[in-house]
C-alpha cells in the first residue's frame, strides 16, 4: 500500500507502507496538488500542468464536480472542508477518478467538527461502496507528527466500512499508471520476452 503525503520529509521511518507519493504544490514530488476556488481557475491551472505526474485537486464542491470530469485529474484530495455530493461520487466512478480518504483531517480537528467529519466519512464510504468508486486511504500527513503506520490507517478506515483490499488496489493502479513503464491498463501489461524455450 502507498501513502500520499503533503510534505517532503527528511528522514522517513519505516511505517509499513510499500512506498510514498509526495503530493506537493511545487512540482518536485511524484504528484502535483492543484488548489482552485472556481471551475474556471481549475481549468486554467490544469492547462499549466506540463509534467507527467499524479494530479490531485483540492477545492470546494463545484471545483470537485468539475475536476472529476477532467481527463487530467487523477484524485480528489481530502481536507477538512471537502464535501462531495452523491452525483460527484457517481461521476468519479464513471470517469475513474479516485477519492482520497485521509486520516490527518481527524487529527487536526476536535469536538463537534470531528464528529461531523466521522458522519460525513461514513456516508461517503456508503456511496463509494454502492457505486464501486475508486478510492485510496492515506495519512495525507502535512508534517512529521501526522504520520501513522499502515496498520493504523487501514484499521481506522476499516472500522467505518472501507474495503481495504480495494483501496490498496486503486492506490497501486494509480501509481503504476505513471511510474511503471510495463503498465498499459488493468489487465494489459508489456511482458518481457525470454529467450529460453522460444523456437
Curated annotation (Swiss-Prot):
Gene Ontology BP annotations: tRNA 5'-leader removal
First-tier enzyme category under EC: hydrolase
A GO molecular-function descriptor: ribonuclease P activity
Keyword hit for Calcium: no
Superkingdom, natural source: Archaea
Catalysed reaction, written as an equation: Endonucleolytic cleavage of RNA, removing 5'-extranucleotides from tRNA precursor
One annotated Gene Ontology cellular component of this protein: ribonuclease P complex
Subcellular location: Cytoplasm
Protein family according to the UniProt entry: Belongs to the eukaryotic/archaeal RNase P protein component 3 family.
Entry function: Part of ribonuclease P, a protein complex that generates mature tRNA molecules by cleaving their 5'-ends.
Subunit-structure text: Consists of a catalytic RNA component and at least 4-5 protein subunits.
Name by which UniProt lists this protein: Ribonuclease P protein component 3
Species, as recorded: Archaeoglobus fulgidus (strain ATCC 49558 / DSM 4304 / JCM 9628 / NBRC 100126 / VC-16)
Lineage: Archaea, Methanobacteriati, Methanobacteriota, Archaeoglobi, Archaeoglobales
Amino acid at each position: 500500500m502507498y501513502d500520499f503525503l503533503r510534505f517532503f520529509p527528511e528522514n522517513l521511518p519505516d511505517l509499513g507502507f510499500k512506498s510514498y507519493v509526495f503530493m506537493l504544490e511545487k512540482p518536485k514530488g511524484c504528484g502535483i496538488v492543484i488548489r482552485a476556488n472556481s471551475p474556471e481557475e481549475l481549468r486554467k491551472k490544469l492547462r499549466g500542468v506540463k509534467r507527467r505526474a499524479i494530479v490531485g485537486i483540492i477545492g470546494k464542491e463545484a471545483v470537485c464536480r468539475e475536476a472529476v470530469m477532467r481527463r487530467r485529474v487523477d484524485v480528489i484530495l481530502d481536507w477538512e472542508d471537502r464535501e462531495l455530493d452523491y452525483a460527484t461520487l457517481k461521476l468519479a466512478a464513471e470517469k475513474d477518478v479516485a477519492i482520497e480518504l485521509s486520516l490527518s483531517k481527524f487529527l487536526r480537528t476536535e469536538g463537534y467538527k470531528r464528529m461531523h467529519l466521522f458522519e460525513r466519512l461514513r456516508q461517503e464510504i456508503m456511496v463509494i461502496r454502492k457505486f464501486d468508486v475508486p478510492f485510496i486511504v492515506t495519512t495525507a500527513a502535512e508534517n512529521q507528527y501526522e504520520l501513522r503506520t499502515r496498520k493504523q490507517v487501514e484499521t481506522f478506515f476499516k472500522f467505518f466500512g472501507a474495503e481495504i483490499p480495494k483501496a490498496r488496489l486503486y492506490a497501486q493502479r494509480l501509481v503504476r499508471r505513471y511510474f511503471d513503464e510495463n503498465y498499459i491498463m488493468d489487465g494489459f501489461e508489456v511482458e518481457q520476452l525470454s529467450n529460453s524455450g522460444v523456437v
